[in-house]
């Protein structure tokens, strides 16, 4: 999808949302942000890397000690960048020069997340039980 979520009547509040596995995440800031969260899913990541990742990122994966973790780290970087820009994912990932800053997070083992913004952001995680 293209575009960014917004709160009508409150343009000063920027936010982005994501969900995967047992987690839903929402990031708030005073500047535009993009955020993605992914649960590691063993079955699909290798095929997705072959299809979507640049040749350079595929080489990094082939040489990585923990390729699965690196895959989800790269994927969340790309997804959060596209969400920050409001363009979503498109074309071969990792082929364009990126502006801004990416901050990684992981709510628990088996999950990778990233927040992208024009300047470094501080991440504060809060678990809310149903």
Residue ranges and their predicted role:
Residues 1-130:
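Core catalytic alpha/beta fold that binds nucleotide/phospho-ligands
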């Amino acid at each position: 999808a293209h575009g960014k979520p917004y709160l009508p009547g409150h343009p000063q509040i920027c936010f982005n949302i994501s969900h995967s596995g047992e987690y839903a995440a929402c990031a708030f800031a005073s500047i535009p942000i993009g955020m993605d969260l992914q649960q590691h899913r063993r079955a699909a990541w290798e095929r997705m890397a072959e299809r979507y990742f640049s040749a350079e990122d595929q080489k990094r994966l082939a040489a990585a000690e923990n390729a699965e973790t690196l895959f989800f780290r790269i994927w969340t970087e790309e997804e959060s960048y596209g969400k920050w820009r409001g363009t979503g994912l498109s074309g071969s990932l990792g082929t364009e020069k990126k502006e801004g800053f990416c901050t990684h997070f992981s709510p628990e083992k088996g999950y990778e997340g990233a927040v992208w913004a024009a300047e470094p952001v501080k991440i504060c995680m809060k678990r809310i039980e149903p």
